[in-house]
């Protein structure tokens, strides 16, 4: 798998945004991705130094459409801790530039 296939999208929530102050970034990753693959992909794409990777599997939530019941897709979240001397990842575009 290539690096762009492993990292699918950043997770932007209140908790993940607060964790960015401590250089912890949350990404949705491929269901088959390992911690080592996620670490190498983040280092390659964003040119940063990763210290630690935590991964969790998130079950799909039950959703109803009338009397029919279905589930949202399951996903895999990776929380990536960058080193103290590493640059920050710019997830949001700067309006000043």
UniProtKB/Swiss-Prot annotation:
Gene Ontology cellular component annotations, sorted alphabetically: ribonucleoprotein complex; ribosome
GO MF term (any one): rRNA binding
Cystine pairings recorded for this chain: none
Keyword Ribonucleoprotein appears in the UniProt entry: yes
InterPro entries tied to this protein: Nucleotide-bd_a/b_plait_sf, Ribosomal_uL23-like, Ribosomal_uL23/eL15/eS24_sf
Superkingdom of this protein's organism: Bacteria
Entry's family note: Belongs to the universal ribosomal protein uL23 family.
Assembly notes: Part of the 50S ribosomal subunit. Contacts protein L29, and trigger factor when it is bound to the ribosome.
Its biological purpose: One of the early assembly proteins it binds 23S rRNA. One of the proteins that surrounds the polypeptide exit tunnel on the outside of the ribosome. Forms the main docking site for trigger factor binding to the ribosome.
HAMAP family per the UniProt record, alphabetical: Ribosomal_uL23_B (MF_01369_B)
Protein name, as recorded: Large ribosomal subunit protein uL23
Organism: Limosilactobacillus fermentum (strain NBRC 3956 / LMG 18251)
């Amino acid at each position: 798998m290539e690096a762009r296939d492993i990292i699918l999208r950043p997770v932007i929530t209140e908790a993940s945004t607060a964790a960015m102050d401590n250089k912890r970034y949350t990404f949705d990753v491929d269901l088959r991705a390992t911690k080592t693959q996620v670490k190498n992909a983040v280092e390659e794409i964003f040119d940063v130094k990763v210290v630690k990777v935590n991964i969790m599997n998130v079950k799909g939530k039950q959703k109803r459409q009338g009397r029919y019941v279905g589930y949202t897709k399951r996903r895999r979240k990776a929380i990536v801790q960058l080193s103290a001397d590493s640059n920050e990842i710019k997830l949001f575009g700067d309006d000043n530039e």
